[in-house]
């Protein structure tokens, strides 16, 4: 392995255009893998992770960091194909970046690149991505999503203020119910499944 400074100098020469070219090559490789699999329906998991750093590297900031609270870090947004266990795309952000920042744009890029390769895409995300802009991006392209909703007090109130929920047994020990509601500041109601 070369000295870290050599790698750092090499990576320092990358421009936005260079990194975008690398991301495009990655999409082409993933599409070949997807075409070879002949899958017509896929689940894409969107998530972020923290990369700890020591010192004051460019682009780092103090943010959510469960391993080393108060330490500077990067926050990396990534997308994986569940069926193929394969990385699709991602990018690194400053450590103090909110989880959902850039996710709608990344999802739009995924859709643009994979639209001709699969019939159905279901995007799966945790509550950090419970954002109407993300949902509108997915719905606008005609795809599906599963996003864990944040348990805001006003949403929980809406669950119990309206008509009683019709609960159905699920998985021998759980019950589920459906409700359509519009979270505050959202343009229209959405379907929620309560477990």
Question: What is the predicted role of each segment?
Answer:
Residues 4-78:
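Active-site-proximal, Lys/Arg-enriched surface segment
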Residues 97-154:
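Domain-level cores of phosphate- or acyl-group-handling catalytic modules
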Residues 144-195:
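An anionic, glycine-rich sequence signature occurring as long contiguous blocks
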Residues 54-59, 88-92, 132-138, 156-161:
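Short acidic, glycine/serine/threonine-rich loops at helix termini
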Residues 48-50, 81, 89-94, 127, ...:
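Short, structured patches in soluble enzyme cores that scaffold and shape functional sites
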Residues 38-41, 74, 86, 117-119, ...:
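Short coil/turn connectors at secondary-structure junctions
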Residues 66-116:
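Electropositive, glycine- and tryptophan-enriched low-complexity nucleic-acid-binding patches
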Residues 1-3, 7, 40-51, 85, ...:
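Short, conserved catalytic/metal-binding motifs centered on acidic residues
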């Amino acid at each position: 392995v070369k000295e870290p400074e050599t790698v750092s100098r090499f990576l320092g020469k990358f421009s936005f255009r260079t990194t975008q070219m690398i991301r495009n090559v990655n999409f082409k490789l993933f599409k070949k893998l997807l075409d070879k699999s002949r899958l017509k329906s896929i689940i894409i998991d969107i998530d972020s992770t923290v990369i700890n750093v020591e010192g004051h590297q460019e682009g780092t900031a103090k943010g959510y960091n469960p391993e080393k609270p108060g330490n500077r870090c990067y926050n990396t947004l990534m997308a994986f194909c569940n069926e193929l266990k394969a990385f699709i795309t991602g990018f690194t952000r400053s450590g103090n970046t909110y989880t959902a920042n850039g996710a709608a744009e990344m999802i739009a890029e995924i859709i643009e690149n994979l639209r001709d390769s699969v019939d159905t895409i279901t995007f799966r995300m945790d509550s950090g991505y419970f954002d109407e802009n993300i949902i509108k991006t997915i719905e606008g392209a005609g795809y599906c999503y599963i996003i864990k909703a944040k348990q805001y007090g006003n949403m929980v109130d809406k669950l119990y203020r309206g008509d009683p929920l019709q609960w159905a047994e699920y998985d021998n020990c759980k019950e589920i119910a459906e409700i359509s509601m519009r979270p505050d500041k959202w343009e229209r109601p959405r379907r929620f499944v309560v477990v």
